[in-house]
Amino acid sequence: MQNYQSHSIKVLKGLEGVRKRPGMYIGDTNVGGLHHMVYEVVDNAVDESMAGFCDTINITLTDEGSCIVEDNGRGIPVDIHPTEKIPACTVVLTILHAGGKFDNDTYKVSGGLHGVGVSVVNALSKRLIMTIKKEGQIYRQEFEKGIPTSELEIIGKTKSAKESGTTIEFFPDESVMEVVEFQAGILQKRFKEMAYLNDGLKISFKEEKTQLQETYFYEDGLKQFVKDSAKKELLTPIISFKSMDEETRTSIEVALAYADDYNENTLSFVNNIKTSEGGTHEAGFKMGLSKAILQYIGNNIKTKESRPISEDIKEGLIAVVSLKMSEPLFEGQTKSKLGSSYARALVSKLVYDKIHQFLEENPNEAKIIANKALLAAKAREASKKARELTRKKDNLSVGTLPGKLADCQSKDPLESEIFLVEGDSAGGSAKQGRDRVFQAILPLKGKILNVEKSHLSKILKSEEIKNMITAFGCGIQESFDIERLRYHKIIIMTDADVDGSHIQTLLMTFFYRYLRPLIEQGHVYIAQAPLYKYKKGKTEIYLKDSVALDHFLIEHGINSVDIEGIGKNDLMNLLKVARHYRYALLELEKRYNLLEILRFLIETKDALSLDMKVLEKSILEKLEGLNYQILRSFATEESLHLHTQTPKGLVEFNLDDNLFKEVLFEEANYTYQKLMEYNLDFLENKDILAFLEEVENHAKKGANIQRYKGLGEMNPNDLWETTMHKENRSLIKLKIEDLEKTDAVFSLCMGDEVEPRRAFIQAHAKDVKQLDV
């Protein structure tokens, strides 16, 4: 084993300022920063793996709120540091920029700076425990907010002299971090990615709270990565290869395949860090791939059709490019783009040689790849011709604009906005109600084409899509120019029903796939048309959704209730909490039935700590008190099953740990505890939810509450006042927070693969909170 001792740890400077400006080190103090702390510790263990000294990493999220990261690497050095005169492991945990990665002999490649990460994590943790197994001994040291609270001490011996490794357990400090509760879903994705990129590394992940336990291990990680990334059927086998350039100490690994898809999905990494903006390695990959395939087509296929270009090679491509290099040069602090110039030539030559060889040795697969490129070229030419139809001679001339477009008078894009309105009826109301100076209206007939299932050549034949592209003025694909955008606000305005939601989704899919910069630069919005209209006498109020309606009913209903012992504002706040409690209960009832039992479990003190047999007896007594007939009841140590006859019919109820782990159950329990913080003596033993209903009924008495299904039901003035007037309206700006996750959602929900969508719907059907049928 290579010698890894205190002299390998280089020291730069102390930890001053980390707690004052944590965002400089972990990005932010919210969800992203919290999980970045985990990655920093895990990355150190992965670096041990890349150096060849670790093959197992265990990560545990504990019930106490801590994260434990354990590896079987060499263990951080414990001998006295030559310049700091304290144990080297203490230096690594307490001094910024102290780590083995500044010593080129310790780590040939690394994702970051060893010691920077773990010392920052220490500074931002209210408590951190370091345990090291090294040279037959087990060492331990504790820290609080980056400061040692104990000396490094020997607490035992290892089972064997060869056993080694480092364990870090840290508790995020809530006085610095806005969020301290880890989210398993975020971490799972990253750990799986790490296992893909490091053949033979076993990463085990456990969450004690949910008893989740997963292990990620791949013998041929990149090939599996490509296979798992494919959303549609693969047309070719997965091609994979790797190489090591000794001169630059750069390892290159590539895996790719072609799928029956129009979209490209190329992922690139440097030292396990995702380079989402690409860089020289990704450019080199595409250069080498294009050169090999285009050369093959030129030498082997005669065609009178359009010749493919590099752009055509990308259609249907799924690829992962992973580099491990000693001193990568990144552009910017985020490390999302590689700038090392020599990487382009290295990757390009390797990819060209390997793909050229594959095509020569596999004529059937070569023909499939060539035909895919030829079809893409043909479609590109058809799209080019179709695009010409959407171009105008003059960007602001109305002469070539769609006939259905009611344009605005202003020619200033900064103040101009266009409403994409569902149907001619609503379009008519919008045209009459708008401010003609700066508001344009484009009615859309029916549901537009689902672009996820269509090629661009077909998309550009769609009348509604052509009208939108022409109206926007910015073009599409390679002719796209955001400087020519005629409206800086594009507002989707649809009915508040299932069809309206579908049209919104189709439009969002179109914008995401073909006009993504409009979303990224904040030009696309969704109008929040009111769902309800409350009318009583001369009072007319428009309400956005059921929450707004309930709050309005509470605020106006209490005026008709004579209550002593509680102030009006306190009563209003209490009833809003009660409304939230009722909502959580009703959502739970959809899954578990018997609202009465759910309330009993939440509202009965210590009910959740009772033995299941004792709990069964209490529940049966409760149901019998309600005159429900118990038909069958069966309890084990862990669950209760019963059938009972209620006024609503025969009901089955199953009780086990799954109920108590439900987020909605926790929400209901939390809101009930909030209710109990109020003095409820004024109710005189009346049920709080019954009182809430009484208050709401007072507000409803003599009132007409209309639920809008369509914008066409509103007269032009109402539509203007509620949805289009800048002073009154509510708009939602579209944002893309996680590109990969967004891409996956559109592919799943809007693509032509039925089975994954069916499975998703079946898995999440009970989670639906607003179903319009």
From Swiss-Prot:
Subcellular location(s) of the protein: Cytoplasm
Q: Which SUPFAM superfamilies match?
A: ATPase domain of HSP90 chaperone/DNA topoisomerase II/histidine kinase (SSF55874), Ribosomal protein S5 domain 2-like (SSF54211), Type II DNA topoisomerase (SSF56719)
Report the superkingdom from the record. Bacteria
Q: Where is the Toprim domain?
A: 416-530
Q: Where does Mg(2+) 2 bind?
A: 495, 497
Q: Name one GO molecular function term.
A: DNA binding
- Coarsely, its chief localization is cytoplasm
> Per its UniProt record, what Gene3D superfamilies does this chain match?
3.30.230.10, 3.40.50.670, Histidine kinase-like ATPase, C-terminal domain (3.30.565.10)
Q: How is the cofactor bound?
A: Binds two Mg(2+) per subunit. The magnesium ions form salt bridges with both the protein and the DNA. Can also accept other divalent metal cations, such as Mn(2+) or Ca(2+).
GO annotations of cellular component type: chromosome; cytoplasm
Q: Which Pfam families match?
A: DNA_gyraseB, DNA_gyraseB_C, HATPase_c, Toprim
Cofactor(s) recorded for this entry are: Mg(2+); Mn(2+); Ca(2+)
Which EC numbers does the record give?
A: 5.6.2.2
The site (Interaction with DNA) lies at 447, 450
PROSITE patterns cross-referenced by the UniProt entry: TOPOISOMERASE_II, TOPRIM
Which reaction is recorded as catalysed by this protein?
A: ATP-dependent breakage, passage and rejoining of double-stranded DNA
- Role played: A type II topoisomerase that negatively supercoils closed circular double-stranded (ds) DNA in an ATP-dependent manner to modulate DNA topology and maintain chromosomes in an underwound state. Negative supercoiling favors strand separation, and DNA replication, transcription, recombination and repair, all of which involve strand separation. Also able to catalyze the interconversion of other topological isomers of dsDNA rings, including catenanes and knotted rings. Type II topoisomerases break and join 2 DNA strands simultaneously in an ATP-dependent manner.
Q: Which family does it belong to?
A: Belongs to the type II topoisomerase GyrB family.
Assembly and interactions?
Heterotetramer, composed of two GyrA and two GyrB chains. In the heterotetramer, GyrA contains the active site tyrosine that forms a transient covalent intermediate with DNA, while GyrB binds cofactors and catalyzes ATP hydrolysis.
Please name the PANTHER family in this protein's record: DNA GYRASE SUBUNIT B, MITOCHONDRIAL (PTHR45866:SF1), DNA GYRASE/TOPOISOMERASE SUBUNIT B (PTHR45866)
Note in the entry: Few gyrases are as efficient as E.coli at forming negative supercoils. Not all organisms have 2 type II topoisomerases; in organisms with a single type II topoisomerase this enzyme also has to decatenate newly replicated chromosomes.
UniProt protein name? DNA gyrase subunit B
Organism placement in taxonomy: Bacteria, Pseudomonadati, Campylobacterota, Epsilonproteobacteria, Campylobacterales
* Gene symbol of the encoding locus: gyrB
